[in-house]
């Protein structure tokens, strides 16, 4: 029996999308049929109050891209992200997480 031919995905991207968009926040939710990934940009946190008057910190976020994928795609997505994260850290060192509570990157 002949081996299965290799499958190669040839990705194309429009000139409008080649630059990409910046995102520093990811929201994920799902239905029985798909996962939705909302990539967003956060703004500086602001003190505020909830409906009962309790103090809250509000972080305005603007969604810059929404991606919907079927659940079956998530396995390959997670595998690919993990492989790339390992490669990144092998090349550049471990990624340092910001301290808990930091919701907006400090000025550099």
Task: Report each predicted region and the residues it spans.
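N-terminal intrinsically disordered, cationic/polar leader segments
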Residues: 1-72, 76-108
């Amino acid at each position: 029996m002949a081996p299965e031919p290799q499958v190669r995905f040839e990705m194309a991207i429009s000139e409008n999308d080649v630059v990409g968009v910046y995102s520093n926040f990811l929201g994920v939710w799902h239905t029985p049929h798909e996962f939705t990934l909302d990539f967003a940009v956060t703004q500086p946190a602001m003190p505020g109050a909830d409906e009962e008057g309790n103090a809250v910190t509000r972080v305005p976020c603007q969604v810059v891209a929404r991606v919907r994928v079927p659940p079956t795609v998530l396995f390959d997505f997670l595998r690919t992200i993990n492989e790339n994260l390992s490669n990144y850290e092998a090349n550049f060192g471990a990624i340092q997480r910001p301290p808990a509570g930091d919701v907006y990157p400090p000025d550099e």
